[in-house]
């Protein structure tokens, strides 16, 4: 423990600096699948992870130190840093240990499980730090931009880190889910999209009914351009897709119920369209919940703009549909992680269409990973420049006063 605290106090421990010089190695869903299905070898996985996991940790740990000091000094942020440092040091112990020793493989597996459990609360803990910072120091556009940039990369790194750990522990830990025997780790080779849609809807519906006592119905339509009249399937991580869909259904239900609660005709259904083309698998969720003004769309994905109240520390007092306001930005990161995206199209006064885009081919679904390099460093160090587009002032200029002022200047020059 003395070594741990000594390293934590150093500006940049040498091992972190060394590993951060390497770029992460992005894998495709097909590579995950092929390894787990055809030639799953625990020794090979161990040899890869004992290098790759420290590289991914080191890249994000170097970037953390570029955040404003006032944010780094928040207790919650310090706690997250300590978790990352501890996990990094535990992984370093296996840097040179031979995979031929079965005890090494068993111990490494247990270390990965402990690390995963330790990092379970990284998102809410870091969110707490951002809230503490915002409450004490207010909102600054430049710092907010840097925090947005960092958190997108930080949380993406966390998604990828857990993906690697989950694949190893599920393949070699003997904790395969009997309900999904065909899964390769956390990947479903034949993920039925409509089934995940319905599961996410039912979970969101349960919460909506628990809080509002009612919930809109669901209408699902499929259009398979590759194989007409057949169910749409994709090689994907069902838990990732569920996370995105649940968040979107939750938002649609809340908006729909609150807008139509006093209307006699009831609640309009939430409609879902699933389509599969040559390149993209798209899922559109449409509601009639009143929509959002265009100027607010970007704010829905901004960590610093969240209008959600600070969540209660007592679970019994927390509203089921409340949180840190991170649901949409994190969901978009899940979509982008394997080269997809999540977009919102809203018509104020009517409703919102939320579209999830995924790659149709697993060979094109490569991890999208943040890399710590000079470009990333410059993003934090570059000072904001003047806007090169006009900005409307808060009050329109009175042309008559301006003209009178110019006439007075001219008359003074005459004398």
Swiss-Prot record:
<dbReference type="GO" id="GO:0004740">
    <property type="term" value="F:pyruvate dehydrogenase (acetyl-transferring) kinase activity"/>
</dbReference>
<feature type="region of interest" description="Disordered">
    <location>
        <begin position="383"/>
        <end position="415"/>
    </location>
</feature>
<dbReference type="GO" id="GO:0035357">
    <property type="term" value="P:peroxisome proliferator activated receptor signaling pathway"/>
</dbReference>
<feature type="binding site">
    <location>
        <position position="287"/>
    </location>
    <ligand>
        <name>ATP</name>
    </ligand>
</feature>
<dbReference type="GO" id="GO:0097411">
    <property type="term" value="P:hypoxia-inducible factor-1alpha signaling pathway"/>
</dbReference>
<dbReference type="GO" id="GO:0005759">
    <property type="term" value="C:mitochondrial matrix"/>
</dbReference>
<dbReference type="InterPro" id="IPR036784">
    <property type="entry name" value="AK/P_DHK_N_sf"/>
</dbReference>
<dbReference type="GO" id="GO:0018105">
    <property type="term" value="P:peptidyl-serine phosphorylation"/>
</dbReference>
<dbReference type="GO" id="GO:0005730">
    <property type="term" value="C:nucleolus"/>
</dbReference>
<feature type="domain" description="Histidine kinase">
    <location>
        <begin position="131"/>
        <end position="362"/>
    </location>
</feature>
<feature type="binding site">
    <location>
        <begin position="323"/>
        <end position="328"/>
    </location>
    <ligand>
        <name>ATP</name>
    </ligand>
</feature>
<keyword id="KW-0808">Transferase</keyword>
<feature type="binding site">
    <location>
        <begin position="306"/>
        <end position="307"/>
    </location>
    <ligand>
        <name>ATP</name>
    </ligand>
</feature>
<dbReference type="GO" id="GO:0010906">
    <property type="term" value="P:regulation of glucose metabolic process"/>
</dbReference>
<keyword id="KW-0067">ATP-binding</keyword>
<comment type="function">
    <text>Inhibits pyruvate dehydrogenase activity by phosphorylation of the E1 subunit PDHA1, and thereby regulates glucose metabolism and aerobic respiration. Can also phosphorylate PDHA2. Decreases glucose utilization and increases fat metabolism in response to prolonged fasting, and as adaptation to a high-fat diet. Plays a role in glucose homeostasis and in maintaining normal blood glucose levels in function of nutrient levels and under starvation. Plays a role in the generation of reactive oxygen species.</text>
</comment>
<dbReference type="InterPro" id="IPR039028">
    <property type="entry name" value="BCKD/PDK"/>
</dbReference>
<dbReference type="InterPro" id="IPR036890">
    <property type="entry name" value="HATPase_C_sf"/>
</dbReference>
<keyword id="KW-0547">Nucleotide-binding</keyword>
<keyword id="KW-0496">Mitochondrion</keyword>
<dbReference type="InterPro" id="IPR005467">
    <property type="entry name" value="His_kinase_dom"/>
</dbReference>
<dbReference type="GO" id="GO:0010510">
    <property type="term" value="P:regulation of acetyl-CoA biosynthetic process from pyruvate"/>
</dbReference>
<dbReference type="GO" id="GO:0005524">
    <property type="term" value="F:ATP binding"/>
</dbReference>
<feature type="modified residue" description="N6-succinyllysine">
    <location>
        <position position="278"/>
    </location>
</feature>
<dbReference type="GO" id="GO:0071398">
    <property type="term" value="P:cellular response to fatty acid"/>
</dbReference>
<feature type="binding site">
    <location>
        <begin position="247"/>
        <end position="254"/>
    </location>
    <ligand>
        <name>ATP</name>
    </ligand>
</feature>
<dbReference type="GO" id="GO:0005739">
    <property type="term" value="C:mitochondrion"/>
</dbReference>
<keyword id="KW-0809">Transit peptide</keyword>
<dbReference type="GO" id="GO:0004674">
    <property type="term" value="F:protein serine/threonine kinase activity"/>
</dbReference>
<keyword id="KW-0418">Kinase</keyword>
<comment type="subunit">
    <text>Homodimer. Interacts with the pyruvate dehydrogenase complex subunit DLAT, and is part of the multimeric pyruvate dehydrogenase complex that contains multiple copies of pyruvate dehydrogenase (E1), dihydrolipoamide acetyltransferase (DLAT, E2) and lipoamide dehydrogenase (DLD, E3).</text>
</comment>
<dbReference type="GO" id="GO:0071333">
    <property type="term" value="P:cellular response to glucose stimulus"/>
</dbReference>
<comment type="similarity">
    <text>Belongs to the PDK/BCKDK protein kinase family.</text>
</comment>
<protein>
    <recommendedName>
        <fullName>[Pyruvate dehydrogenase (acetyl-transferring)] kinase isozyme 3, mitochondrial</fullName>
        <ecNumber>2.7.11.2</ecNumber>
    </recommendedName>
</protein>
<dbReference type="Pfam" id="PF02518">
    <property type="entry name" value="HATPase_c"/>
</dbReference>
<dbReference type="InterPro" id="IPR018955">
    <property type="entry name" value="BCDHK/PDK_N"/>
</dbReference>
<dbReference type="GO" id="GO:2000377">
    <property type="term" value="P:regulation of reactive oxygen species metabolic process"/>
</dbReference>
<dbReference type="Pfam" id="PF10436">
    <property type="entry name" value="BCDHK_Adom3"/>
</dbReference>
<feature type="compositionally biased region" description="Basic and acidic residues">
    <location>
        <begin position="395"/>
        <end position="415"/>
    </location>
</feature>
């Amino acid at each position: 423990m003395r070594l741990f605290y000594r390293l934590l106090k150093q500006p940049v421990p040498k091992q972190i600096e060394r590993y951060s010089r390497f770029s992460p190695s992005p894998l495709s869903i097909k590579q995950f699948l092929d390894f787990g299905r055809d030639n799953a070898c625990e020794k090979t996985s161990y040899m890869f992870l004992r290098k790759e996991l420290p590289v991914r940790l080191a890249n994000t740990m170097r970037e953390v130190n570029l955040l404003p000091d006032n944010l780094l000094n928040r207790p919650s942020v310090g706690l997250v840093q300590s978790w990352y440092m501890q996990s990094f040091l535990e992984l370093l112990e296996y840097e040179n240990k031979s995979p031929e020793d079965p005890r090494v493989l068993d111990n490494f597996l247990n270390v990965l499980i402990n690390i995963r459990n330790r990092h379970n609360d990284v998102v809410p803990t870091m969110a707490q730090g951002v809230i503490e910072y915002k409450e004490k120091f207010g909102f600054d556009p430049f710092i907010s931009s840097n925090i947005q940039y960092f958190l997108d990369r930080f949380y993406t790194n966390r998604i990828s880190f857990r993906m690697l750990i989950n694949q190893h522990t599920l393949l070699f830990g003997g904790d395969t889910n009997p309900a999904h025997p065909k899964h390769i780790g956390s990947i479903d080779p034949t993920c039925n999209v409509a089934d995940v849609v319905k599961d996410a809807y039912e979970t969101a519906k349960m919460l909506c009914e628990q809080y509002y006592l009612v919930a809109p119905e669901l209408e699902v339509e499929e259009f398979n351009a590759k194989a007409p009249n057949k169910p749409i399937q994709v090689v994907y991580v069902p838990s990732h897709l569920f996370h995105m869909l649940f968040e979107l259904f939750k938002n649609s239900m809340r908006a729909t119920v609150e807008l139509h609660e006093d209307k006699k005709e009831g609640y309009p259904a939430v409609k879902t369209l699933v389509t599969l083309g040559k390149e993209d698998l798209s899922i559109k969720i449409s509601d009639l919940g009143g929509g959002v003004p265009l100027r607010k769309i970007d704010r829905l994905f901004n960590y610093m703009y969240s209008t959600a109240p600070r969540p209660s520390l007592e679970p019994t007092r927390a509203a089921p549909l409340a949180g840190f306001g991170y649901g949409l930005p994190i969901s978009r990161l899940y979509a982008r992680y394997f080269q997809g995206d999540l977009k919102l199209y809203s018509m104020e006064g009517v409703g919102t269409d939320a579209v999830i885009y995924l790659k149709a081919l697993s060979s094109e679904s490569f991890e999208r990973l943040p890399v710590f390099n000079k470009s990333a460093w410059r993003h934090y160090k570059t000072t904001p420049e003047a806007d090169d587009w006009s900005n409307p002032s808060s009050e329109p200029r009175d042309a008559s006063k301006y003209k009178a002022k110019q006439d007075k200047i001219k008359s003074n020059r005459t004398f």
